[in-house]
A protein has these predicted regions:
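Conserved "HGTGT" condensation-loop signature of ketosynthase/thiolase-family condensing enzymes
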Residues: 1-74, 93-97, 108-127
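Active-site-proximal alpha-helical scaffold in enzymes
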Residues: 79-109
Length: 130
């Protein structure tokens, strides 16, 4: 079994309607809070994992770029409601396996009125009452 993995810090942007803010701006508030909580700096982060649903191709790169973390490997995770938890699991696996010592996981979504219409299979899931 690999090394023990812990969550050093957490951050959260207050929930609510924020039409004036980009996804990256929302993520930055949470990321800065997590760094402060953990007592680490941006330069300490070796990899980023971004969980989202409908932010599109390259969402992790854009989000981490707006947060201020560039030049590190970024993994995008698009797995519907399990996106962010899977991103955390992937980060933990990478740390446990000795690939990284410190990674940041960002779970981000900006809900729109037409959100589920853009998710492939949403109608089928609804019909199946899942």
């Amino acid at each position: 079994m690999g090394e023990r993995v812990v969550i050093l810090g957490v951050g959260l942007h207050p929930f609510g309607r924020h039409p004036e803010k980009s996804v990256g701006e929302l993520a930055r508030v949470a990321a800065l809070g997590a760094l402060k909580d953990a007592g680490v700096e941006f330069k300490d982060i070796q990899a980023g994992f971004c969980g989202h649903v409908v932010q599109g191709v390259g969402a992790g790169l854009r989000t981490f770029g707006e947060v201020g973390l560039t030049g590190i490997p970024i993994t995008n995770v698009e797995l519907a409601c399990a996106s962010s938890s899977r991103a955390a699991m992937l980060a933990a696996d990478a740390i446990s396996g000795g690939i990284y010592d410190l990674a940041m996981v960002i779970g981000v979504e900006k809900m729109e009125r037409v959100l589920l219409s853009g998710v492939g299979g949403a109608e089928e899931i609804g019909r199946a009452h899942v």
